[in-house]
Amino acid sequence: DEDQVSLATAAAGISDVLRYTLTCSDADYSTMVPQAMAALTEKGYRVEKFRNAWGGKFYQGVNVHLMSPAGVRVELQFHTPQSFAVKQASHAVYEIRRNPASSAEEVEEATRLSIAYNAAVVVPEGARAIHWPVAA
C-alpha cells in the first residue's frame, strides 16, 4: 500500500525514543550544561538540535537532540530539581493541550495552568545565556 511507511523511515522521524534527563542544582546548572555538552561531543555525539527554553511559557530547561556515534537518536533534557518537578507535574495539562479531541475550554484551562506552573520556576543564574556551540 502506498500509504505505508518503512520502519526505517518512521524511526528516523522519532527523536525521543531514548530520552534522558540530567538534573543539576541551580548553583551548578550554568556550568554543568556546557560541560556535559562538551563531553558528549568529544565522545562523538552530534548535536542535531539545541533548544534553550529558559524563560519560556510552557517549558523550563534545555532540550537537546543528539545522534550517537552508533547512529541512535537520543533526546537529553537538562533540568533543575524544580524545573523537572514542574515538567512532571504539568505533563497532564501538556497532553490536554496537544490532544485534538480536547475542547477549546479544556485547552484554554490547560494552557492557563501550564503557564502558571512554568512561571513559578526559578531560572538559575546564567541559564538563559547557555547556547551551543559555545562562542569562542
Where are these regions (language model features)?
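Long beta-strand-rich cores associated with HINT superfamily self-processing modules
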Residues: 5-136
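Active-site-proximal segment of RNA-dependent polymerases
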Residues: 1-2
